[in-house]
Amino acid sequence: MSITKQELRREALQRLKAAALADPAQLRSATLRRKLAAVLGGDSRCVAIYAPLPHEINLLPLLREYPQHRYVFPLCLPGRQLQFRHVLSPERDLIPGAMNIPEPAAHTTIVPPEEIDILIVPGVAFTRNGARLGYGGGYYDRFIPRCTRARVLALAFEEQLVAEIPAEPHDLYIPELITPLT
């Protein structure tokens, strides 16, 4: 593959931002959240999600739509490590973090990776066979192996699907990808 990860990331972000302007991500997110409902099920689970950027899938309504689950959000730590924390109310428990991305406040409770049942991984681009292009920090590539019992998946808009992503030895594949058309 001749395109670099940086070039692919830039192109994918441009497509996502253009699509979000034409059709707000909130409206498109509802379709993917409905598909995710089958994965979540009715039993109480620990679900790792993330606060969305404007062009990303908005998972915050899950807290209201499926309140039986315990939702945990990532906090970026030094050394490009992630720590997940329990969030009851995004309005109260999330604060602006690095690059103004909402992250859990200091008063939230740390949740060990082995307690996570479902880990929803963000990304810029994906292939149908599970290759993932993130934002370039490798945070999730380091964190996923620590989630020993989690069902790992990603949600993606059609604009995020690409034929190929250049892979490096540390890059992990996402075993399950949910799109509007899958």
Q: Where do the model's predicted regions map?
A:
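Surface-exposed, charge/polar-rich loops and edge strands
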Residues: 1-7, 14-18, 68, 114-119, ...
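Short capping loops/turns at secondary-structure boundaries
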Residues: 109, 132-133
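Short secondary-structure transition/capping segments
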Residues: 94-98, 121-130
